[in-house]
Amino acid sequence: MLRKVVLLRLCPLLGRPAVSASSGSRREVASGVPPSGSTSPRALNIFDRELKRKQKNWAARQPDPMKFDYLKEEVGSRIADRVYDIARDFPLALDIGCGRGYIAQHLDKETVGKIFQTDIAEHALKNSLETDIPTVNILADEEFLPFQENTFDLVVSSLSLHWVNDLPRALEQIHYVLKPDGVFVGAMFGGDTLYELRCSLQLAETEREGGFSPHISPFTAVNDLGHLLGRAGFNTLTVDTDEIQVNYPGMFELMEDLKGMGESNCSWNRKALLHRDTMLAAAAVYREMYRNEDGSIPATFQIYHMIGWKYHDSQARPAERGSATVSFGELAKLNDVMSHEKK
């Protein structure tokens, strides 16, 4: 399923002001943050996680961080909608890579009794948004969760998992901390995110400098996501795709907002600097190839939404192979008989 929504830059989506953390919230430093450079042996070391922490902290310390929250607010509200669709209560929930708390603010205490929010950026946790739900903020890495097995009824994550080096491990950790019959509801950027910016930078850099370097971080393909969830132990999987299109005055405004979101590139093989004339050429290419009728330029954010359950005996299961009492061939004969009777 694919949905497409068009947003305007800097227009508040939900009209909710950013306020100080609730008096019931507290911040703890957890042992879940690994030593620098530690990953599992199978992980590809694609992203500079320390740089990503600094980027997110810088964004959270800006005088008006809400100015750049529009995309994460929107996706956070969509995850909350999916939680409400499940129509059950969750006494204890966990938000992984919570940022400033973009999911919890859209949930209510009738649905979620208490929520733990984790992030690698301490300033994002310090400046988290207010919620009615009792909240505990914990500094922790997505790949190294400091919780015991079978702890949470619900785990959510919004626009964070695309920055982990070891996504299979992160999903296994989520499955590990869920209780049996617990559910994971998440969202991450997909492979077509910012394709307009990627193409414009590549064309301009090739023309001006005789080659190009990656300036947009790599993303997981949607056909890999279901496999990774299944391998992590989840069942009854749902994976669907949204596209959110945001219109900007120009390419430089888009890049400014990405920085304000804490979503700048942090891959190890990124190019440290682009020449000014290359950037100007990329902006011209972007406008020429993609501009809207009103002169603005679109930026596409592809969102992969995922839902997976941890196994429990009470869950519905497919029948064993060969247990059917009627074959598809017999059903086809029945259809022929009914068609003949109608004549």
From Swiss-Prot:
Its EC number is 1.-.-.-, 2.1.1.-. The keyword Transferase applies. One of its GO terms (cellular component) is matrix side of mitochondrial inner membrane. One of its GO terms (biological process) is methylation. Keywords: Membrane, Methyltransferase, Mitochondrion, Mitochondrion inner membrane, Oxidoreductase, Transferase, Transit peptide. It holds the Pfam family Methyltransf_11. Residues 1-29 form a transit peptide. GO terms for molecular function: monooxygenase activity; S-adenosylmethionine-dependent methyltransferase activity. Gene3D superfamilies: Vaccinia Virus protein VP39. It comes from the Eukaryota. CDD domains: AdoMet_MTases. The keyword Transit peptide applies. It is found in: Mitochondrion inner membrane. Transmembrane segments: none annotated. Belongs to the methyltransferase superfamily. Arginine hydroxylase that mediates hydroxylation of 'Arg-122' of NDUFS7 and is involved in the assembly of mitochondrial NADH:ubiquinone oxidoreductase complex (complex I, MT-ND1) at early stages. May also have methyltransferase activity. Interacts with NDUFAF8, leading to stabilize NDUFAF5. Interacts with NDUFS7. Interacts with PYURF (via TRM112 domain); the interaction is direct and stabilizes NDUFAF5 protein. This is Arginine-hydroxylase NDUFAF5, mitochondrial. It comes from Mus musculus. The gene is Ndufaf5.
